């Protein structure tokens, strides 16, 4: 997949400029005690929207226009709601955003499944073979991530560890794990929104310039820094430096693994989309809550995360 400076510029403006331009609004929301979750949801749409807008403006031939326009329209709606949420009463904004995600995801499947196969193949949207390999990769990812969560809780010891084991003896995590399966099909678009930008577009662009390994690492760094507005005003406002460091650790190492998975399965974009979905959504299963805002992160947490993620995922850089 070849690109040029004009397309890269459009991508960068959508993927990076918009999130950073949202920082004053995030600050306003934080100062006024308003929920900033909708900004995080909207930001996931921007990378793919940048790719799609770049391709459409370049008048590339044979683009899947219906799907592209749908995603861009959904992105515009999410962006508009984010802006409005900073100034208008917040009741209902997140519910409306979730409704938009569901409707857009369902329409997305319809447009994709009724699109010509040649268009899907030309623009990296086909579900390729090697499904058994993809399944093995997903199982590995779930197993090691679950083990990492258990290890982190075990290191806390005492009542925290006992309570966590008791949580797994209830039906809650198992029911939530089952619910996540159909939920993927109703909410895939934000995760696709990131992976189509990072893995399908930016990774090969940087690998062509810097080589396969350095290109994958560079995307991981850029992906991590892309989260900076959320690190400052959503994930961990009180320990933002630690949050940024932890984000870089996670994005560089997971970026290596997601790129490995993408290329191992014949550049099948749907595998990193599923992996990204599992990484984000399984938090509900692992912890019993979907709230990832206002975290308190220590430098010890960052160091432990760097060791675990580095040991588990960085070796795939050599694969």
Task: Report residues per predicted region.
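Membrane-interface helix-boundary motifs at transmembrane edges
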Residues: 2-4, 57-67, 90-92, 120-128, ...
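Membrane-embedded alpha-helical segments in integral membrane proteins
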Residues: 16-31, 77-89, 226-231
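Loop-to-helix transition at the N-terminal end of transmembrane alpha-helices
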Residues: 33-51
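Short, hydrophobic transmembrane alpha-helix segments
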Residues: 24-38, 57-65, 86-93, 319
């Amino acid at each position: 997949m070849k690109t040029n400076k004009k397309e890269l510029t459009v991508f960068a403006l959508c993927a990076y400029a918009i999130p950073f331009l949202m920082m004053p609004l995030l600050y306003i929301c934080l100062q006024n005690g308003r929920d900033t979750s909708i900004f995080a949801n909207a930001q996931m749409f921007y990378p793919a929207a940048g790719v799609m807008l770049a391709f459409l403006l370049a008048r590339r031939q044979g683009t899947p226009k219906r799907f592209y326009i749908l995603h861009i329209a959904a992105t515009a709606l999410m962006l508009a709601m984010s802006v409005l949420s900073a100034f208008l009463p917040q009741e209902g904004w997140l519910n409306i955003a979730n409704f938009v995600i569901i409707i857009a995801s369902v329409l997305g499947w319809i447009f994709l499944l009724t699109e010509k196969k040649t268009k899907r193949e030309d623009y990296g949207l086909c579900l390729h073979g090697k499904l058994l390999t993809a399944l093995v990769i997903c199982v590995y990812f779930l197993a090691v991530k679950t083990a990492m969560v258990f290890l982190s809780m075990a290191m806390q010891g005492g009542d925290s560890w006992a309570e966590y084991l008791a949580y797994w003896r209830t039906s809650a995590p198992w029911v939530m794990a089952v619910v996540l399966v159909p939920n993927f099909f109703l909410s895939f678009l934000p995760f696709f929104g990131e992976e189509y930008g990072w893995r399908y577009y930016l990774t090969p662009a940087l690998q062509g310039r810097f080589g396969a390994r350095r290109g994958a690492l560079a995307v991981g760094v850029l992906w991590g820094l892309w989260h900076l507005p959320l690190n400052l005003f959503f994930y961990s406002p009180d320990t933002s430096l630690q949050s940024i460091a932890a984000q870089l650790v996670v994005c560089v190492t997971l970026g290596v693994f997601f790129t490995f998975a993408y290329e191992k399965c014949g550049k099948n974009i749907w595998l990193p989309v599923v992996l990204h979905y599992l990484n984000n959504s399984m938090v509900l299963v692992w912890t019993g809550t979907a709230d990832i805002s206002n975290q308190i992160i220590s430098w010890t947490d960052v160091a432990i995360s760097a060791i675990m993620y580095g040991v588990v995922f960085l070796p795939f850089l050599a694969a």
